């Protein structure tokens, strides 16, 4: 009886022995697959530099506000295109007016990043009030004062004394327009300021003087040589002697209150570059020494 029981037991034992390799093999396979799943999880949790770190932030768009003398309009409008092409994130916005008007606006808190004046008086006033960055202030350009008359008119002026034979003569308001101040100094040096008072027409800026002469509203007017060069409706009758008035200098300065100091300095340096000087020269300005 005991012998009959041994056979089934041996058969069962043998079957169990044969099943062991299969079980171990299954565990090995599971173990081998685990790292593959873990690697995929690691990739998802830690994205590659290409998908995260290399994504650049969008460049901030900046608007620079430039208060500039009206006589700089044409040259700065051309340079605006050049500068913005080099600095795609910067947009230049110009406020053109008489230098004295711009000075008052800035003193009263009007926003501005740069100031370009047609006279040192206006710039010096802002420097004295500590509104200009002393390290970013320089004389940029020089100009000439001329007397213009209509191209197709019959007005003839050979010297300053001939002005007493004319009708109305336009000049910028001396208190706020540098060209008007230079005209006043020139007329005073020739003892003509008082005699011509009944004939003087005061304007808000030098561009208005030019317009009055172009349209024949006045017989003559004092403007900058650069303004006269931009119009075919006027011609230069006289050039004021340099010694008859203060030097005509165009200072430039960065405001201390600018909220974009990096971009403002970039524009400041660009306007001093050889490329900018060539453009200014094309409009009749002379780069300051």
What function would you assign to each model-found segment?
Residues 1-12:
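Bacterial N-terminal signal peptides that target proteins for export
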Residues 113-117:
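Periplasmic-binding protein-like
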Residues 126, 130, 134-138:
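Central helical "cap/lid" subdomain
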Residues 19-23:
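C-terminal motif of bacterial Sec signal peptides marking the signal peptidase cleavage site
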Residues 24-81, 100, 104-107, 119-120, ...:
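Exported/periplasmic ABC-transporter solute-binding proteins
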Residues 81-94:
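Signal peptide-proximal N-terminal region
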Residues 89, 111-112, 218:
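Short, high-confidence coil segments that cap the C-terminus of an alpha-helix
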Residues 64, 90-92, 145:
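Conserved beta-strand core positions
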């Amino acid at each position: 009886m005991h012998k009959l029981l041994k056979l089934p037991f041996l058969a069962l034992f043998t079957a169990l022995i044969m099943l062991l390799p299969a079980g171990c093999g299954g565990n090995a396979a599971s173990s081998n697959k685990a790292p593959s799943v873990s690697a995929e999880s690691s990739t998802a949790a830690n994205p590659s530099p290409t998908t995260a770190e290399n994504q650049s932030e969008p460049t901030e768009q900046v608007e620079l506000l430039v208060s500039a003398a009206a006589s700089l309009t044409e040259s700065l409008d051309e340079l605006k295109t050049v500068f913005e092409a080099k600095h795609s994130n910067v947009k230049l916005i110009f406020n053109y007016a008489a230098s004295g008007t711009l000075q008052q606006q800035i003193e009263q808190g009007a926003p501005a990043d740069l100031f370009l004046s047609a006279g040192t008086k206006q710039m010096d006033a802002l420097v004295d009030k500590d509104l200009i960055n002393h390290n970013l202030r320089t004389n940029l350009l020089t100009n000439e004062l001329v007397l213009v008359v209509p191209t197709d008119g019959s007005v003839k002026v050979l010297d300053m004394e001939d002005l007493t034979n004319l009708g109305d003569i336009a000049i910028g308001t001396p208190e706020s327009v540098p060209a008007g101040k230079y005209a006043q100094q020139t007329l005073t040096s020739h003892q003509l300021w008082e005699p011509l008072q009944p004939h003087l027409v005061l304007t808000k800026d030098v561009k208005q003087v030019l317009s009055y002469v172009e349209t024949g509203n006045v017989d003559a007017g004092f403007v900058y040589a650069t303004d006269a060069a931009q119009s075919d409706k006027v011609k230069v009758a006289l050039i004021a002697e340099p010694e008859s008035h203060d030097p005509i200098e165009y200072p430039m300065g960065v405001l201390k209150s600018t909220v974009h100091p990096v971009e403002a300095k970039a524009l400041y340096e660009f306007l001093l570059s050889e490329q900018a000087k060539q453009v200014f020269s094309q409009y009749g300005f002379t780069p300051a020494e």
